């Protein structure tokens, strides 16, 4: 609850249990920060719930994480590498799959050295988009401020998908440059 700034942990855990019980392939993503530096404990917990695939990312300054207090919990590259090293070892021990999803946060050599084979690139408008509770379509799940592509409740999907902004973001993502478009200029995106 502290990490996301809202109550909901118990509901989230129940949702994971329900998804696993229904036979759905369930993945859990965790933004890594000083509040959950012992990510290995999180992996053990979700493994007990039946989760076998996890992703993690750096703490992205978007949405509720835009506050100074939240940004103060961000891990340095060295801290993030240490947390990931332990996470990869724990995932191997538990027979889980793990991927790091923040493009540009750690050098490719570091990720490969940790045994991570997927080197993240931005997937905005290419492999992922998201819908906010009020129906706004955003380029990715972290893109919570600024650019919206339309409203799923009121706009035709093809107008959103084929819109000029969506096409421009998708074209940039398709270059697979291992950067986050949210962080261009300040390197603080995904």
Region locations from a protein language model:
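Flexible mid-to-C-terminal extensions adjoining Fe-S/redox cofactors in radical SAM and related proteins
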Residues: 112-113, 136-137, 141-190
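Radical SAM enzyme [4Fe-4S]-AdoMet core and its adjacent flexible, acidic
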Residues: 2-124, 128-138, 144-151
């Amino acid at each position: 609850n502290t990490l996301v700034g809202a109550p909901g942990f118990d509901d989230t855990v129940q949702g994971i249990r329900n998804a696993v019980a229904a036979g759905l392939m369930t993945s859990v993503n965790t933004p890594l920060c000083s509040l959950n530096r012992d990510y290995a404990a999180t992996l053990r917990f979700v493994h007990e719930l039946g989760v076998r695939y996890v992703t993690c990312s750096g703490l992205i300054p978007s949405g509720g994480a835009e506050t100074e207090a939240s940004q103060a919990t961000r891990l340095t590259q060295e801290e993030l590498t240490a947390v990931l090293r332990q996470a990869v070892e724990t995932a191997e021990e538990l027979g889980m799959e793990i991927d790091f999803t923040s493009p540009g946060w750690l050098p490719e050599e570091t990720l490969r050295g940790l045994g991570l084979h997927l080197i993240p690139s931005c997937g905005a408008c290419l492999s992922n988009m998201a819908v906010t509770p009020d129906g706004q379509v955003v380029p990715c799940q972290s893109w919570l401020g600024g650019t919206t592509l339309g409203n799923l409740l009121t706009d035709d999907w093809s107008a959103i998908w084929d819109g000029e902004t969506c096409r421009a973001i998708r074209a940039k993502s398709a270059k697979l440059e291992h950067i986050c478009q949210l962080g261009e200029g300040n390197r603080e995106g995904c």
